[in-house]
Amino acid sequence: ASFGEAPPGNPKAGEKIFKTKCAQCHTVDKGAGHKEGPNLNGLFGRQSGTTAGYSYSNANKNMAVTWGENTLYDYLLNPKKYIPGTKMVFPGLKKPQERADLIAYLKEATA
């Protein structure tokens, strides 16, 4: 199923998902440094593997995907399938509602 078929996202629920499943490796704060994973500020509309100052896998650099609702929805289902060779160890979010919530949060928090 595509993002177009996803349930409406709830940013508050997405923030909880981010804090429990993403924040150990990522931040969304403008100007903050990278953690284990890259800072996600400015994520929407950015090409994969291009955040300055972060050492990406060749897989992320070569994928050249532009991050948006549709690409994130597919990526977050199964990151290692979407970008084979990615360094991201997160197994993904199988529930469409959780992916929609996280994307709704990221859209607000990374702008």
Swiss-Prot record:
The modification N6,N6,N6-trimethyllysine is found at K80, K94. It holds the Pfam family Cytochrom_C. GO terms for cellular component: mitochondrial intermembrane space. The modification N-acetylalanine is found at A1. GO terms for molecular function: electron transfer activity; heme binding; metal ion binding. It is found in: Mitochondrion intermembrane space. Heme c binds at C22, C25, H26, M88. Binds 1 heme c group covalently per subunit. One of its GO terms (biological process) is mitochondrial electron transport, ubiquinol to cytochrome c. InterPro entries: Cyt_c-like_dom (IPR009056), Cyt_c-like_dom_sf (IPR036909), Cyt_c_1A/1B (IPR002327). Keywords: Acetylation, Electron transport, Heme, Iron, Metal-binding, Methylation, Mitochondrion, Respiratory chain, Transport. Electron carrier protein. The oxidized form of the cytochrome c heme group can accept an electron from the heme group of the cytochrome c1 subunit of cytochrome reductase. Cytochrome c then transfers this electron to the cytochrome oxidase complex, the final protein carrier in the mitochondrial electron-transport chain. Belongs to the cytochrome c family. This is Cytochrome c. It comes from Solanum tuberosum.
